[in-house]
Design a protein with these regions (language model features):
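Metal-dependent phosphoesterases centered on the DNase I-like endonuclease/exonuclease/phosphatase
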Residues: 49, 120-209, 213
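Active-site beta-strand/loop signature of hydrolases that rely on acidic residues for catalysis
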Residues: 6-7, 22-40, 100, 126-148, ...
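Structured beta-strand-rich core segments of catalytic domains in phosphoester-bond hydrolases
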Residues: 36-106, 117
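Active-site-proximal beta-strand elements of phosphoester/diester hydrolases
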Residues: 1-9, 94-107, 139
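Short Gly/Pro-enriched turn/cap motifs at secondary-structure boundaries
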Residues: 55-58, 81-83, 205-208, 233-236
Length: 248
């Protein structure tokens, strides 16, 4: 299985890049975040042939999407979102024994308590999924740098949102309680430059002075089958890079 997660930062502005990414990578599963469009605003050309597609957005804010290749999962896919998702931030699908979710966690800058509540609900949902015996893959912009090294030294500031202890504790709690593994870190444990987001100024992206906030978290047995995980820093004009993960 090849899986891509990408905060596209506006699908209408980057529809050609999205089409190029799918055509080039031929992924089995695509998770998008921050599509910033309702289904009615998304042109038909963004429903690539050969994929089950679900756009879960409400206009110029937030929104997620999930695409599943017909050749990977031949049955009609049923997409859903959990009850705590009131801002178009989660879409999931059960692909046999694997539940895949595209998730966009609030940044927290405007309403930090709401971010913590969302993370708490996500942890509970993931815990319940794991308790039901399903493998779980959570992909997306989780807006938390899990470790200190997931923020470039030049970007670190005391007590900044995205690095606070309570945020990291919640995300670590999800990993522990749901039995999932940070695939990128598992495959490249000593790399301190696995960044996926860069502020759009001072050539920070070109200099790779960024944050690692986009993840693929997979149940341990599935994570053990992960072969590669790459942040495609050179691709596209979103402030986030696509993360491409392959499993055997």
């Amino acid at each position: 299985m090849k899986l891509i997660t990408w905060n596209v930062n506006g699908i209408r502005a980057r529809h050609a890049q999205f089409a190029d990414l799918v055509a080039t990578e031929q992924p089995d599963v695509v998770c998008l975040q921050e599509i910033k469009a309702s289904p009615e605003q998304i042109p038909e050309l963004l429903a690539p042939g050969g994929y089950w597609v679900y756009w879960h957005g409400a206009g110029g804010y937030s929104g997620v999407a999930l695409l599943v290749c017909h050749s990977y999962f031949t049955e009609q896919v049923t997409f859903f979102h959990p009850s705590f998702d009131i801002e178009n931030r989660v879409v999931a699908a059960d692909l046999g024994a694997i539940r895949v979710a595209s998730v966009y966690v609030p940044n927290g800058g405007k309403d930090y308590p709401a971010k913590l509540r969302f993370l708490e609900s996500l942890v509970q949902w993931a815990r319940e999924t794991a308790a039901g015996g399903q493998s779980l893959v959570i992909c997306g912009d989780l807006n938390v740098a899990l470790e200190e090294r997931d923020v470039h030294p030049k970007e670190r500031k005391p007590n900044q949102i995205g690095t606070r202890p309570e945020e990291r504790a919640l995300l670590n709690g999800l990993i522990a309680d749901a039995g999932v593994v940070d695939v990128g870190r598992r495959l490249d444990p000593d790399n301190n430059e696995l960044f996926t987001w860069w502020a759009p100024w001072r050539n920070l992206r070109q200099r790779n002075i960024g944050w690692r906030i986009d993840y693929v978290l997979a149940s341990a047995p599935l994570a053990e089958r992960a072969l590669t995980a790459q942040s495609r820093r050179e691709f596209g004009t979103s402030d986030h890079a696509p993360v491409v993960v392959t499993f055997s």
